[in-house]
Amino acid sequence: MPEWQVEEGIGERRALLLDGETPLAAGVHWPGEIQAGDEFEGKLLRKTGARGTAQHPSGREVLVDKLPRDASEGANYLFAITRGAMTERGRFKLPAARPVSTIAGTISDPMANARSVRRFPLGVWEDIWHAASSGEVDFAGGSLLFAVTPAMTLIDIDGDLPPRELSLAAVPQIARWLTLFDLGGSIGIDFPTLQTKSDRKAVDSALEEALSGFSHERTAMNGFGLVQIVARLHGPSLLHRFATSRIGMAARMALRRAAMVEGPGATLLTVHPALRPRLGPEWIAELERRTARPVRIAIDPGLAIEAATAQIVPHDD
């Protein structure tokens, strides 16, 4: 039976939905983030019709909608976060919330009851992380190319197979990586142009079956091969985090690698110069506490930002 597992990392909480050692979904939370599903009592600061702005207990502002007609500025209400804050190119989107009374049921956080583990099965998180970092996923006969834009996440399909076969081969991979990248919001899929209506219908049917467990709305494929998916957006996907916080993602992975090496001695963590300022004293102190080893940091301009290395070296005399 699939099970959510979490690694309590330094500077992040990583989650995987695993069926044995097969990943089905993934996600990341960073400390201090306001997350979908959080409930809070906050003051309504501004109101325009059914929309407005409320103050979160952290002091941050939250966009709210579905306000009742008699809601008053300055009064306190119980809200539930429906979407975390989003950083996009050139702008920052505040978290979004609604009055708890307007939400049917609850907005569940799958990580809330996850089992904490020291580490995930070998290589599973690394494969997902590197795929999100590159924005490319290979499959037999082709590849998926992901691009994050302010309007939507775009998926381009490339390969050497005939258009119909390439499109059908891409469908199960699209379904798989939507959840592994924790994608939501507006998603555009650019299939190869299919000349016949029957070919387009075959791909639509394959998508319907592959996405049957993924809550969404979807358009039929148009004559240019474009399909649009709209799914609930809870917060930044792995792709969004790399698009807006690549150095932050790489710094956290560097710490994970350093935490995973074993043996007596000191930990030598070698990073690209851009990562060094992100490895603050609190994170390094926590790494030393967890590993019971001193940490040395070396700088190597020849390393890629994502390619930090960690190894055990002898203690200084």
Describe the residue ranges of each PLM region.
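Active-site phosphate-binding and catalytic loops of NTP-dependent enzymes
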Residues: M86-F92, H130-A140, F214-E217
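A short, contiguous, amphipathic alpha-helix enriched in charged residues
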Residues: L17-E39, R118-S133, P162-E165, A169, ...
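Active-site loop/lid in soluble adenylation, ligation, and acyl-transfer enzymes
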Residues: G59
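Domain-start "cap" segments at the beginnings of catalytic or binding domains
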Residues: S108-N113, R118-F120, I128-V137, G141, ...
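Conserved glycine-centered short motifs in functionally critical loops
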Residues: A140-D316
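Charged, low-complexity intrinsically disordered tails
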Residues: G11-G27, E39-E41, T48-G52, V62, ...
